[in-house]
Amino acid sequence: MTILFSMPVHPQPIIDSGHRFDASRHWPASLTLGFAAYPEADTRITRMNVARHYGPLRVQRAFYPEGRDGCCHVYLLHPPGGIASGDSLTIDVTVSENAHALLTTPAANKLYRADSNNVAWTQHTHLKVEDGATLEWLPQETLAFDGSRGEQTVIIDLAETAKCLGWEIIGLGRPASDLPYVSGMIEQRFQLSQKGRPLWLERQAIDPTHPRFLGKWGQGGATVHATLWAVGLSDPADTITELRDKIPANHNWAVTYRRGVLLLRYLGMERNEAWDLLQQAREILRPRLMDVKAVTPRIWLT
């Protein structure tokens, strides 16, 4: 006869890996960059003097395609290639007096579908430009998958004589794959101030279930939204005239100038059309704003 003895089972301690996959999931990443102008011989050279990162958000090295005394080009890298539920990205950039920096990305950013707990993502960007400095904020487009939920914030603080040229482009859904953006919620907030005085404040809730999404009085069903801004122009009226004369007119874009901010908007269905429009506008705006020609970042050509 076989006798079986039961051994006491001692529960093993649960080790928290720091990664959660429930409704409390939160995976942060941050990047802090600083740029300063250093005198050298009879000119100034902009160098990246601060580069701190946490998590999968970083830069490699600066490039000088316009010469050593020209604009400092830096590419923002996010190796995962997209933002998922619980991701929290924070970018802080400061361009000090008389420096000139251009920031862009190597590819489109992706906003993935929310998980089964509907956990949102967040992306916060804070850009600070000091007197005599110039910042070009030129990320490639953001592609929002159906069901994506999150909040995107851009805050720009400019000193009195600072200059800034930037844009944001978002494409909703994947129409080419017959996967439109029919669920989810993306809240975008923009805040641009100069000397602490708000010049442009905007909040846009992208909700495909709201009548505004399809209504002619709202987004009209447009799947691509783009906004370009420019601050520091000395001849805004002539600049707007040139934009309207040189860029082919259609009902998808318009340009305005109020309180020192030039805004060019696109509302349509084609990402390539929006991208081409903003590049054409930059070809006109950069010489007027910075007195240098519009050099294309190398990464856009790869």
Swiss-Prot record:
GO cellular component annotations of the record: cytoplasm
Keywords recorded for this protein, A-Z: Chaperone, Cytoplasm, Nickel insertion
Pfam families for the chain: UreD
Localization of this protein: Cytoplasm
Main location: cytoplasm
Organism: Psychrobacter cryohalolentis (strain ATCC BAA-1226 / DSM 17306 / VKM B-2378 / K5)
Gene Ontology molecular functions: nickel cation binding
Subunit record text: UreD, UreF and UreG form a complex that acts as a GTP-hydrolysis-dependent molecular chaperone, activating the urease apoprotein by helping to assemble the nickel containing metallocenter of UreC. The UreE protein probably delivers the nickel.
Family recorded in the similarity comment: Belongs to the UreD family.
Keyword rRNA-binding among record annotations: no
Domain of life: Bacteria
InterPro entries, per database record: UreD
Gene: ureD1
Name of this chain's protein: Urease accessory protein UreD 1
Function: Required for maturation of urease via the functional incorporation of the urease nickel metallocenter.
